């Protein structure tokens, strides 16, 4: 009805291309416009000024001969002041942008190894954006932003990369575990050494106390029982120690100690060996 009356509506973020007898006349801004169609005025088409997005998937090969799919996302929009160029000069904007993306990616990625391509995604995106901006500005389009969304290697390469990463992580974990075991063993050895040191001090003090006690016993027995010599007292002490030892060994049913020689007569031999050792020490 509006067109029949010569009225046309242009929506927000949109411009209309007005022609007069097939020739470009002017760009109509959003709003209501009078269009006298009876004198050859008409709308050739509408052009959106909204930001549009185009995702481009490009297959190429890296410097180390790995085939990858590079996914680029290009955001672009038509410029209102160059609406006539954007409308008339390009027949298929998306295909034109895609061609430039292919060209830049296939010129950049083959110069990089696969790992470098992952690290330099921003540099690739910047190269694509610069080339697009330079090429598309003459056609009335602005490149808002360009992103390299993903770099997808071949499935076999991806599996190999995952295995390499897994092996590296396992190696780090093994090293950490070995280091922890090493520290644990060192601490255990230090604790064992300290324990043995303290045990040695305890044994030394115990034996010192035994020696002091035996000395006091020998002196007291010799003073209180006339006619006894130190030898008689030592023999009696050794017999007492023998029976105490046998009692301690037999007190436990699970004892693994073996007393050799075990006969009572062996006490005499032990005493003789002690005396002989003392005599030899004095002679030396």
Swiss-Prot record:
Predominant location category: membrane
Organism: Oryza sativa subsp. japonica (Rice)
Claim: Lipoprotein is one of the keywords in the record: yes
Signal peptide: none
InterPro entries in alphabetical order: Band7/mec-2_domain, Band_7, Band_7/SPFH_dom_sf
Annotated GO CC locations: plasma membrane
Origin: domain of life: Eukaryota
Lipidation (N-myristoyl glycine): 2
Name the UniProt record assigns to this protein: Hypersensitive-induced response protein 1
Keywords: Cell membrane, Lipoprotein, Membrane, Myristate
